[in-house]
Amino acid sequence: MIKKNRDAEVYALGQHICMSAHKARRVIDQIRGRSYEEALMILELMPYRACYPIFKLVYSAAANASHNMGFNEADSVISKAEVNDGTSVKKLKPRARGRSYLIKRPTCHITIVLKDIYLDEKYIIWLRKYGWIYRNKYTDMTCRDMYGSGGVWDKK
């Protein structure tokens, strides 16, 4: 049995969100397994109403990760994203001749779990296997601040 590092995971939970679970699942399936920054970019550009509450949850999970655990947001990956059915909000709509029709508004519960990939043991083993880590020193190939250093376009 593989032990999971529980210290490497942070979650955000949104309950009783007024939308169909089926419609929310369509959006959640697009971001599951992606990095935090890539998921935010996808959610900003998708034209669905379900994107905004999910965007807020992903952002909240990253804020929890950086504040509570001290994770770097750029190193976070959405390891688990699930949508469950919630209760139906029932309303009565008045109709002619004193009748009323029942309106059911579906709700859902959304859970987003972020994982820091640098605290995951399998990822560290994979990095060692392909030569990215030498003697417990990590070789970083990413450019963190691409546009902040000035560059050619800032000069007159």
Swiss-Prot record:
PROSITE patterns in UniProt: RIBOSOMAL_L22
Please name the GO terms of the biological process aspect recorded for this protein, alphabetically. Answer: translation
User: What is the annotated localization of this protein?
Assistant: Plastid, Chloroplast
Entry coiled-coil feature ranges: none
Q: Which InterPro entries match?
A: Ribosomal_uL22 (IPR001063), Ribosomal_uL22_bac/chlpt-type (IPR005727), Ribosomal_uL22_bac/org-type (IPR047867), Ribosomal_uL22_CS (IPR018260), Ribosomal_uL22_sf (IPR036394)
User: Mind listing the UniProt keywords for this protein, alphabetically?
Assistant: Chloroplast, Plastid, Ribonucleoprotein, Ribosomal protein, RNA-binding, rRNA-binding
Q: Name one GO molecular function term.
A: rRNA binding
- SUPFAM superfamilies referenced in this protein's UniProt entry, alphabetically: Ribosomal protein L22 (SSF54843)
Task: Describe the subunit structure.
Answer: Part of the 50S ribosomal subunit.
Q: Report the function annotation for this chain.
A: This protein binds specifically to 23S rRNA.
In which family does this protein belong, per the annotation?
Belongs to the universal ribosomal protein uL22 family.
Q: Which cysteines are joined by disulfide bonds?
A: none
Do you know which Gene3D superfamilies this protein is assigned to?
A: Ribosomal protein L22/L17
In which organism is this protein found?
Buxus microphylla
Annotated protein name in UniProt: Large ribosomal subunit protein uL22c
Keyword Ribosomal protein among UniProt keywords: yes
GO CC annotations?
chloroplast; large ribosomal subunit
A Pfam family this protein belongs to?
Answer: Ribosomal_L22
Q: Which domain of life is it from?
A: Eukaryota
Which gene is the coding source of this polypeptide chain?
rpl22
Where is it mainly found?
plastid
